[in-house]
Amino acid sequence: MAASAWCCLRCCRDGGTGHIPLKEMPAVQLDTQHMGTDVVIVKNGRRICGTGGCLASAPLHQNKSYFEFKIQSTGIWGIGVATQKVNLNQIPLGRDMHSLVMRNDGALYHNNEEKNRLPANSLPQEGDVVGITYDHVELNVYLNGKNMHCPASGIRGTVYPVVYVDDSAILDCQFSEFYHTPPPGFEKILFEQQIF
């Protein structure tokens, strides 16, 4: 009994709590290790400008993921999902089997094939927020919180959120603290946790 009391007093005296600190999970952001050579990432990994593409820092492991991009400045851009094999210097993306993206003209491309298209009167403009849902089969697009009902599919393997810009486009990413509530069942990207 005295030994237990002494341990508690020693921990308090040393300023410790006696607990092992938990590591905080890193925030998902744009990954400067997986970006095109002429891409510029600023705002703590949340804003992309320059020319080229960039992957997010975490893959989409969970069943239903949601993320958003806000168009700060128009130009040429695209958002969606891609594997780590995608060439982030060769834009527009969607030209090969390693990316599935919606381009600034509203067309969704995978493997150089147009898979779907936003209605002509619903193209994203400067200031708009584009949400993406992905469930390992289908990618869906939301414009300012509204489902655009233009699904696309076909990509295989481990995918990451991807964005590309050119011609003065600037986009901000939101991987948490969203502008719009994710659709039911979809949530922010979760880092895979390993328990040993």
From Swiss-Prot:
Family matches, as SMART domains: SPRY (SM00449)
Gene3D superfamilies xref list: 2.60.120.920
Keywords: Acetylation
Domain B30.2/SPRY: 2-184
N-acetylalanine: modified positions: A2
Keyword match Acetylation: yes
UniProt cross-references to InterPro entries, sorted A to Z: B30.2/SPRY, B30.2/SPRY_sf, ConA-like_dom_sf, SPRY_dom, SPRYD7
Highest taxon of the lineage: Eukaryota
Keyword Metal-binding attributed: no
The protein's name in its UniProt record: SPRY domain-containing protein 7
Protein's gene: Spryd7
